[in-house]
Amino acid sequence: GVGDFASNLFWQSISMFLMFFYTDVFGLGAAVAGSILFVARVVDAVWDLFLGYAIDRTRTRWGRCRPYLLFAPPLLALAAWATFTVPNLSPDGKVLYAYATYIALMLCYSLVNIPYSAMPALLSANPVERTRLAEYRMFLAFSGGLLVAAATLPLVEWLGGGDRKLGYQSTVLAMGVLSVLLFWTCFAGTQERVAPLPQRPDLKGELRIILRSRTWW
């Protein structure tokens, strides 16, 4: 469940504050900021297909999904910190920087959360235990979102000392460090006990199914 708490430190920060940060702190126009969010989600949707394929083929002594909780969270924290950093660049340079960092943030978020979300099925085959895991996850996800909502603006003011650029950068850095520690706690405190069914992932077949789906379009 602490993984959901850690995930929501990022997700709720993006949902609640990123658009405001882009327009009022970073200095982007609303249309440009909106296009960045849209393009990043499209790129992430394609990335998720290949990431799922890679996870299916992952075989390590730590399991299939747990290794991602070890190496990916620092990348996610770094991408979040970069996203909420205002570079000293020209207006066009800042737009390119915003595109690059937010796309990187979305890719790293998926790199952590897709394998994390798949873990309950590998931790236990008992439906009662899985239900309990879901309850813990929901509670801690809500708690993480509540912390972001309550603490972000006071932390921005306190850590920035009136400088909102520094305040957002420092606040996201602090949340990133906390999230890495929580994901590593999740890695250390879990063990994949359920062997996945042997199957050969067919990426081409899955892409054909998706492209033919009316829901996708």
Predicted regions and their residues:
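Membrane-embedded alpha-helical bundles of multi-pass transporters/translocases
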Residues: 1-217
